[in-house]
Amino acid sequence: MEESETVLKLRRQLKEAEEERVKAAHYGLELLESQSDLQNQLEEQRNEMTGTIENLEQEKYSLQREVELKNRMLESLTSECENIRQQQKLSLEQLEEQLERNHHRELSEIKDKLEKLKAELDEARLSEKQLKHKLDYQTEVLANKSEELRMMSERVHETMSSEMLTLQLEKTELETAKDNLEQELNELQYREQQLLLTNGNQSRQLERLQTEKEEREKEAVGYFSALEKAREANQDLQAQLDIALQQAQDPNSKGNSLFAEVEDRRSEMERQLISMKVQFQSLQKQHAFSRQQMHRMKIQIATLLQLKGSHSDPEQLERLQAMVAQKNSEIETLVMKVRQLEKSQQICENGPVASSCDGLGQGDETYYVDLLKMKLVNSSKEIDKVKDELSLQRMKALAESQRVLELERKLFTNDRHLKLSQGENMKLRVNLDEMKMKYEPDEMGKIRTQKRRKEQLPLDCLIDNTSVAVTSGTEAHGVSDATPGETCTAESSDDKKLPKEDLSLSTKDQDPSSVLLKPNEPPNGQPPKERKRVRIMEDEKDTPDLNKRNPNNCTITSIHPRSTYEESTSELKKVDEEQEKRKQERKSRLRAPPVLHVPSKPATAQCPQQ
């Protein structure tokens, strides 16, 4: 009754767990559908946003082009205004220079006139002075002559000799000659003064003319340089004019259409560049958002892995409880069988004694009865041998089941440590990503571009391991539950001939996974041959009780694990290959400098290195 209640309770719990799993799957599907809908809506919104941003960028670009055109027009107008201003300034400077030249020329003419007037004034003053001096001299001479004439007239009246008269006449003549000579001397002096005055005037005029000449030479040099510049500019303009005329006359040249085509292409390429920039910015934002979501998911996965590693597996506990209950039931069945065998042995011992007594009483029997007795004795001996072999096989099966349980225990402890290490590794990777995003945001894109395998979450490993362990456990229990009234297959007969040394060597050389997968394979690797099957029949009274207590037959337990072994072999081979790859990667990392990246399935040995 207690066993039935526990079975009902376990079935009820199993049913509730199945219902919860169905609900969780339903809710998960709903969440996936809602997430896909939200993802589609987000994609549509992103497309709309990129379209609007692209349109706004195109409008911005067109407005910028208009502003640039207006700025160019304004610059052209300002340049024209500046050119006009420069032209006006140049014309004003030319006018000023011309006025200065005219003023300078008029000033020079006035200076010339002034110099001439000064020279004439000096000459007039000199002539006036000379005339005054001459007048004074003439008046003095006249006064002297009048005095002499008066004296002569007075002396005329006096008597004088002729010699005296001649001498006086000579004297007068000499005096007149002297006066004439003095007059000539004065005239020459006057002439000399006039010549000196004219010489000074001429020297001053010469100096003025030299200065004018130098100024005119400077003006001529400036005019010549300006003329040369004008000639060069004229030549350049003439060359440009000739080139423009040749291009206009050339039919192959496209002229302004080529520039217009180039401008159109440039504007089109700029529009495409703007659209690509907008799309790149939107994709960059989407990448940042997805990276944040991946970061959060990694944190959640790390916490879940740590929680799952810290908690014990309820399926494992239930399975162990079921195994304990099954073992208890097996012990009870074995005790009942021992009692039944003792009773049957006592009956068999009493049977031959009674038959021997009857034989002595009856006397001589036929030869046929003796033959049957001999056959019965031989069959009983064979039955004893088979029972001994069966007990030995049971002990081997119990040892194998104990070994399987120990290996399962080690496997589950390793799985728990693996999950804990995976959680710690995930946390370390999350912290590493945070530090890289904080201190080296530009290096994240370079690291992301490295080739790496797709990361898979190790959530199904526990299910595979538990299925493999359950199948191995059921096989071991099936072998241990074999009784003389049950059917045994060829695999059970092959296990009888395996020595203990071969089993120990095979378990030492092979991994636990190979021990679990290949319990029936001989050590030489050859497939087992078909052997004869031995079927031992017992009373019908004992068989239904055994079938009730242990409904699983040996054939069922031997056939079902075979299929599960074949399924689990591929999985465990993959696990072995992954372990070898991890060992090779660890050796290469020990040789090469360490590179921090996110692997697909982190191993426990990589945690201390990172």
UniProtKB/Swiss-Prot annotation:
Record's subcellular location: Chromosome, Centromere, Kinetochore
UniProt region (Disordered), positions on chain: 474-610
GO biological process, one term: cell division
Keyword Cell division: yes
Keywords from the UniProt entry: Cell cycle, Cell division, Centromere, Chromosome, Coiled coil, Kinetochore, Mitosis
Name the UniProt record assigns to this protein: Protein Spindly-B
Organism: Xenopus laevis (African clawed frog)
Entry's family note: Belongs to the Spindly family.
CC per GO annotation: nucleus; outer kinetochore; spindle pole
Polar residues composition-biased segments: 549-561
Source domain of life: Eukaryota
